[in-house]
Amino acid sequence: MAAFGLVRFQAYGQTPPPTADPYANNADAGKLKFPLAAPAGKDSGAITTAPPGAVNQGMLDPAKWKYGPAYDAPTNSKIWNPVMIKMMKGEKVTGGTVFSTDSPQTYCAMANAGYDFIWTEMQHDARDWDAVGRMWKACPHAKAVPGVRVAYTDEREIQHAMDLGALVIVIPTVRSVEEGKAARDWTMFPPAGKRSQGGGQAFDPDMWGSVPGGYRNTINDNVVLIEMIETLDGAVAAREIAGLAGVTAVFAASGDLGNFSGYKQGTPDYERLINIVHDAALGAGKRLCGPFAWRDRPDFTCFQNASETAAIARGVAAELGPLKDTQGKPEVGPYAPKK
């Protein structure tokens, strides 16, 4: 639908200004000519015959369609997502978790605290996407880029995340290569995927609308896609999932691999599952992610850190040092020691 907004500007050889509104640049009625339109009241035969000069001739066949150059990234375009830059270099990447707040102020404090990206939790928290959009829009160019763990691999979840401006997408409980491929498809624009172009604040010039090369043409190269291996079925398919084009990293889920296997960290059965994910990432040349406690585990280079409430507690402890928890102890009242 948003492609209609390009008509007037393309007719004059201009580029439409970036905007979050997909209809803002619609051409005025009555000013367009349609030299290739079907004749009024007649079947044009377009399903079998292309107009003269068309690249794709013959019967319309999606499997054989030659995708056009309209959305090619500029030649030698540079990556503008700092997390992708670190991922490509194999450097260690940290994601601070925003779990329960919907406060833009708290989000922005986390985003400027020193993490590489913010893991906005949407699988296990009940906040809505409007709240997420407000948080991300409050400080779009903070030190940490906006990221999110969506609830599932469906179009609605991932489309909301991408249209709001996510630069890191985390997909939970990927159980098969089919699920992994679906997640990739909803994350990426054609021809790499199936993401619909429908506007959203990601296109706003105050967010990513003014990036070099344009958001639509460059986001496929910049979005970081992390797929989580959390189940036994996922472990079986881990090599295929890691090998998917467009998947940046696989995540060995420390909690749910225990939950779904019945074994705790450190036991042979549990560690076997983690090593399967490890081997899948190495074999595919992809990054390997896990909890921050595994910062020094071999070959792990991206991590989920604790939540905003845990970060506050750690920060206060570091600031107060020996003065932490030295409150006065009255003998009576609600602050008196419990007997």
Regions found by a protein language model. Name each.
Residues 88-104, 147-151, 223-236, 307:
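Active-site mouth loops of central-metabolism enzymes
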Residues 96, 121, 169, 183, ...:
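Conserved, mostly hydrophobic/aromatic
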Residues 106, 148, 153-167, 171, ...:
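Catalytic cores of alpha/beta
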Residues 129-155, 159, 187-193, 218-220, ...:
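Alpha-helix-loop-beta-strand connector modules within alpha/beta enzyme cores
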Residues 168-244:
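Conserved anion-binding
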Residues 168-179, 250-260, 301-320:
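Glycine-rich phosphate-binding active-site loops on the catalytic face of alpha/beta enzymes
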Residues 135, 177-192, 263, 309-333:
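C-terminal helical cap(s) of enzyme catalytic domains, especially alpha/beta-barrels
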Residues 30-41, 45-97, 208-221:
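N-terminal amphipathic alpha-helix/helix-capping segment at the start of soluble metabolic enzymes
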